[in-house]
């Protein structure tokens, strides 16, 4: 199942983040999950209730030719080691691009 996590669920992806990004310190993870995740949209793929793949859409304000727009950049792109090479991330990327197009995001 592919879906966006609700605000109160975002902490569920911390274990996957730590597996995928072992170089990130505990302090950084604490900061990121407390402060940066507030505005993120976290798109996940779940199998049997477990998050197996995720990506984070971070909103970013851009200025171009005198205009301002909000554009998401993608971070936290990861899949459990056991779930790799199964097309999980491909399905998330396609869903995200479709959503961003529907939102008319630049």
Regions found by a protein language model. Give the residues of each.
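Short amphipathic alpha-helix that is part of the acyltransferase structural core
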Residues: 1-53, 57-59, 66-73
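Short coil/turn motifs at secondary-structure junctions
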Residues: 60-62, 82
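Intrinsically disordered, low-complexity acidic/polar segments
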Residues: 64-66, 86
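Conserved acetyl-CoA-binding loop-helix of GNAT-fold acetyltransferases
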Residues: 76-79, 85-101
């Amino acid at each position: 199942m592919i879906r966006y996590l609700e605000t109160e669920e975002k902490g569920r992806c911390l274990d996957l983040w730590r597996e995928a990004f072992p170089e990130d310190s505990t302090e950084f993870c604490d900061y990121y999950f407390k402060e940066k995740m507030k505005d993120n949209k976290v798109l996940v793929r779940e199998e049997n209730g477990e998050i197996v793949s995720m990506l984070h859409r971070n909103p970013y304000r851009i200025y171009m030719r005198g205009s301002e727009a909000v554009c998401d950049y993608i971070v936290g792109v990861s899949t459990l080691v056991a779930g790799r090479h199964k097309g999980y991330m491909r399905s998330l990327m396609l869903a995200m691009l479709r959503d961003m197009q529907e939102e008319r995001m630049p």
